[in-house]
Regions:
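Pre-Walker A (Motif I) flank of P-loop NTPase domains
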Residues: 1-5, 68-70
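Conserved GTP-binding G-domain of TRAFAC-class P-loop NTPases and closely related GTPase folds
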Residues: 4, 8, 13, 21, ...
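Conserved substrate/cofactor phosphate-moiety recognition/catalytic segment
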Residues: 17-70
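ATP-dependent NMP and nucleoside kinases share a basic, alpha-helical "lid"
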Residues: 40, 66, 79-121, 134-139
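Active-site metal-coordination segments of metallo-dependent hydrolases
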Residues: 54, 80, 172-186, 219-231
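Short catalytic-loop micro-motif centered on adjacent basic/acidic residues
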Residues: 71-76, 102
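Acidic/His-rich, divalent-metal-binding segments that scaffold phosphate/diphosphate chemistry
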Residues: 151-217
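Divalent metal-dependent catalytic cores for phosphoryl transfer on phosphate-bearing substrates
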Residues: 190-287
């Protein structure tokens, strides 16, 4: 059986370093990196070129190696379900026994940005925001046999985030009566009173923390928090929260956002996780 390892993480989260360490113990593993292919095709890893061409070549080489029973590390950001879906489907459809592992490098955003500034090739700040807005925590039904989270929680990061949430104040949106802190606390207490599973309760406490990064205002001065759930999910991972907490937070807005499409996501997430998502979603609604 060969191994397919997909790295998942923001720029400067440590994907290259993780791959190098892994290779020391597993020297026959092939590493395919989107940055390396950009450099190969265009002479510069920062040259975006044609993403379709880059990833088609990356997928082709990956599948070829797996057919030869070689282990592969697939090194790209892979932050969204859409980013991961194509290659995972192709690997699953190989007439080979392949173990598929997802490695999430949930390095604190602050650390990623510090590392980024120290690199020769600096990724613009807006790219971090774009990737966080697209962040979708992996789930097993995507095709993974195993998902691991690698992080280094830093107490000052949690203190900074909690302070901002506590002092955030009025959410400036007619759908929210309570402050951000009060809303999250009410959601948490509601789930506690229902004797919900512990991961669901904790997800309720943190589910909207991403709003501290995503507040925008419309022409009438009403605040909106688009993709806040994606930010919240990553924040939980970087603070040392569990994979399931991040999954619940990431997908608790699905019943709002995919009217008529719930059945698709119900199948994708699996019945057990979907029921927990609905539990969190309902508590969130009632805590407004």
């Amino acid at each position: 059986m060969s191994n397919f390892i997909m790295l998942i993480g923001l720029p400067a989260s440590g994907k290259d370093a993780w791959a190098k360490e892994y290779i020391k113990e597993h020297p026959n593993t092939q590493v395919y990196s989107s940055d390396d292919i950009r450099k190969e095709l265009y002479g510069d890893a920062s040259h975006q070129g044609s993403p379709a061409k880059i990833f088609e070549l990356m997928r082709s080489r990956t599948l070829s190696s797996l057919r030869e029973d070689k282990d592969v590390i697939y090194n790209a950001t892979n932050v969204s379900f859409k980013d991961r879906r194509g290659i995972l489907s192709q690997v699953k459809n190989l007439k080979k026994e392949v173990k598929i592992t997802g490695i999430i490098l949930a390095t604190p955003l602050k650390v990623c940005k510090e590392r980024n500034c120290a690199r020769e090739r600096v990724v613009p700040n807006f790219v971090f925001n774009k990737m966080l807005s697209r962040w979708q925590t992996p789930f097993y039904n995507e095709g993974f046999n195993e998902i691991k989270v690698i992080t280094d929680p830093q107490s000052e990061v949690a203190k900074e985030y909690s302070g901002k949430v506590f002092h955030f104040g009025d959410q400036k949106n007619p759908h929210h009566t309570f402050s951000l802190y009060e809303h999250c606390l009410r959601c948490y207490m509601s789930l506690i009173s229902q004797k919900a599973p512990v991961e669901v309760c904790l997800a309720g406490l943190f589910h909207d923390w991403g709003k501290i990064f995503t507040q925008t205002f419309d022409e009438e001065g009403i605040a909106h928090y688009y993709q806040h759930e994606n930010y919240s999910a990553y924040m939980v991972l970087e603070m040392g929260g569990s994979l399931e907490m991040a999954q619940l937070i990431n997908y608790h807005m699905l019943p709002y956002n995919y009217k008529g499409g719930e059945a698709t996501w119900r199948v994708r997430l699996g019945e057990e996780l979907w029921q927990k998502v609905l539990m969190l979603h309902q508590a969130d609604k009632e805590a407004h």
